[in-house]
Amino acid sequence: MRIRYGWELALAALLVIEIVAFGAINPRMLDLNMLLFSTSDFICIGIVALPLTMVIVSGGIDISFGSTIGLCAIALGVLFQSGVPMPLAILLTLLLGALCGLINAGLIIYTKVNPLVITLGTLYLFAGSALLLSGMAGATGYEGIGGFPMAFTDFANLDVLGLPVPLIIFLICLLVFWLWLHKTHAGRNVFLIGQSPRVALYSAIPVNRTLCALYAMTGLASAVAAVLLVSYFGSARSDLGASFLMPAITAVVLGGANIYGGSGSIIGTAIAVLLVGYLQQGLQMAGVPNQVSSALSGALLIVVVVGRSVSLHRQQIKEWLARRANNPLP
């Protein structure tokens, strides 16, 4: 295997070590069915993190996806409550997610303002819209909208060939986004845009169209996550995506993406999602409080990112150490 997959292999090895270590504490962690079906608790983070990787590779960022999930979730509930057939309500919810992404892209392209600032604004815009819809539907505060058909609420809890449906959808997204980013001309354009937007523009690369596609895909993935979460919990709430921001960005960075753009890996992000998700699961099964598990997750991110930085710059570090050895301080 080529050296460029070295980081992904290191993450995979770390994932195996993590599972074995938690399995030594609690043998249930080594049960295959438990490992597969526990992914339903966190795999929606991965569904959003995959297209987010491409946005970050392009030199942008989107921190509004959590609010997009909440808006799409409550919109699905309101549509169903209003008598819209469930298939049509799901389709309209997916279109709403893509529209949220296009709003982000349009504001970024035409205002030339930093994507972090724009998506911070839309984060509050979409969150406020979700609360407004929730209030209009009579679901005050964070009270959910329920009463969905059993066929819909069972969907996210089904399994096909022994695999839970949310995990299957994640694997399909993984394949599609990996092929698009790493095996197509359009995907190569994303890397070029992240490395130098000006050069990409002068090279006749459709920068604006590419950015619209990337942010729309992130919005669409957020809507898919919203539909799965509503099905999984049986309730549409405006706060469903509130806790997704940091885990998703952590997975993208941990997976090898450069936060300044120009490099990243879909496979790396996918493995990092499992790494972070199983870390939380393992700590909970070990009886560790949530506050401590969050701190440990942050510590893991710091250690791994520092390790990756050392790995990437090991030649410069060796040269610096050699110079210090030859010229010791008095």
Swiss-Prot record:
Topological region Cytoplasmic: 1-4, 64-67, 110-115, 181-209, 307-330
Induction (UniProt): In the absence of AI-2, repressed by LsrR. Induced by AI-2, via release of the LsrR repressor. In the absence of glucose, induced by cAMP-CRP by direct binding to the upstream region of the lsr promoter.
Keyword Transmembrane: yes
Transmembrane segments: 5-25, 43-63, 68-88, 89-109, 116-136, 160-180, 210-230, 238-258, 259-279, 286-306
Keyword Cell inner membrane included in the entry's annotation: yes
One Pfam family hit: BPD_transp_2
Membrane topology: Multi-pass membrane protein
One Gene Ontology term from the biological process aspect of the record: quorum sensing
GO cellular component assignments: ATP-binding cassette (ABC) transporter complex, substrate-binding subunit-containing; membrane; plasma membrane
Subcellular location: Cell inner membrane
Domain of life: Bacteria
Segments on the Periplasmic side according to the record's topology features: 26-42, 137-159, 231-237, 280-285
Keywords for the protein's UniProt record, in alphabetical order: Cell inner membrane, Cell membrane, Membrane, Transmembrane, Transmembrane helix, Transport
GO MF, one annotated term: transmembrane transporter activity
NCBIfam families found in the cross-reference section: PRK15038.1 (NF011612)
Protein task: Part of the ABC transporter complex LsrABCD involved in autoinducer 2 (AI-2) import. Probably responsible for the translocation of the substrate across the membrane.
Family: Belongs to the binding-protein-dependent transport system permease family. AraH/RbsC subfamily.
Subunit structure: The complex is composed of two ATP-binding proteins (LsrA), two transmembrane proteins (LsrC and LsrD) and a solute-binding protein (LsrB).
Name of this protein: Autoinducer 2 import system permease protein LsrD
